[in-house]
C-alpha cells in the first residue's frame, strides 16, 4: 500500500513537460519558414537588420501597391513590437495578390517564432500562426458556378 501512495504522490507532483521551442537559425543568421494562403505559397527568410522587406527581389511597396496588402504584410512584425528590427526576404508564387500577401504574412509569423521563440504566444493570440484553410469551393455540374444555378424559366 505504501508503494501505491508513493506512486500517486509522484504522479501528482510531476508536471507535464512544456514543449521547448529552440531558436532555428542557419549559418547566415537567418530563420526560414513557408507560409500558405489559398493557392499562394511563400518562402520567407528573416534576419536581424533595419526593417527592409523584399518580395521576389522587389521592395514590398512596389510588389504590393495597395496599402491594405502592405498593412497585411506588416501585421505580425507590428503585433510583436519588432518593427524595423528584421530584414525580410520572401519569394512567393501562385494565386493572386491577396492570397500572396496572406501567404507572406503567415511565413513571416512562422519565421519570427523560429528566430525568437518568446514571440510565439503573442503571434498565436493574434491568429498569425494559424493557416487560413479557406479555399475556393469547386464548381458543381448542373450549376453555373459552385452554388449559383442556371437561370430558371417557367415557360
Curated annotation (Swiss-Prot):
GO terms for biological process: translation. It holds the Pfam family Ribosomal_S9. One of its GO terms (molecular function) is RNA binding. GO terms for cellular component: cytosolic small ribosomal subunit. Keywords: Ribonucleoprotein, Ribosomal protein. The keyword Cell inner membrane does not apply. InterPro entries: Ribosomal_Su5_D2-typ_SF (IPR020568), Ribosomal_uS9 (IPR000754), Ribosomal_uS9_bac/plastid (IPR023035), Ribosomal_uS9_CS (IPR020574), Ribsml_uS5_D2-typ_fold_subgr (IPR014721). PANTHER family: RIBOSOMAL PROTEIN S9, SMALL RIBOSOMAL SUBUNIT PROTEIN US9M. NCBIfam families: PRK00132.1 (NF001099). HAMAP family: Ribosomal_uS9_B. Belongs to the universal ribosomal protein uS9 family. This is Small ribosomal subunit protein uS9. The lineage of its organism: Bacteria, Pseudomonadati, Pseudomonadota, Alphaproteobacteria, Hyphomicrobiales.
